[in-house]
Amino acid sequence: MPELPEVETVVRTLRPQIVGQSIRSLWTSGQSLRMARRLDKGRLQETCIGATICAVRRRGKYILIDFESGSGVLVHLGMTGRLTVADEGKERLKHTHVVWRLVRERELRFVDPRRFGWVQAASEPDQLPEIRALGPDPLTELDGGKLHALLAASRAPIKTFLLDQHRLAGLGNIYVCEALFRARIHPRTQAYKARSKAVVLLRAIQETLEIGIANCGTSFRDFVDATGAPGKNIEALLVYAREGEICLECDGLVKRMVDAGRSTFFCSSCQKR
């Protein structure tokens, strides 16, 4: 699933292509998404057709496309979703579900093979429950003191804590594994026991995310930016997907364990419990 760096990469590559553009028409595939209640074609048409895009931004793992009218569209990429821009004449990929036809014969396309993503039009996107429920953004809305307080109030395992979007917005499995390794914190450490390392952990989270953004995201299979280019961050991963390989910081081996169906990668020498 695209995490904060991947979503930020999509946003940054969308902006120069669609901001200032007007939407001429809208097309939908007619196929249902798994979150079908979100894809209200009538509401999308009413909100989007004739609208001028004035901003594209990220909130957690969500993409918000703002219109000059104050309304907009909220997009979640789910597991395999993509937002790309292409010429009208270019053949559409299989599993294209929504197309916004722009001026200058360009199209903004939402593609999602597994259909876990969704698109929702809203008169006030920032007031949607999904957005209001998000915790602070770790890059722009968090400091050591605030993280310390959040950690102190939780007995959940630190990895579970960091994945909770109500506590911090945007982190996912890849970048949590990487950040915990950088902070030298075992993934099963209870959150409140890590509060003394709040500043170190915040620095590790921010460094991990900034590297991911600089490398345009992590692409194992599906992720591409709005131009169709894959990310390069896989080359910068320290522990994620490196089970059995030698730790880059010591002579130990990277290990994998499974919690709640998710693989967790860590070094038991560097990250002692």
Protein language model regions, located:
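Structured catalytic/nucleic-acid-binding cores of DNA maintenance enzymes
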Residues: 1-273
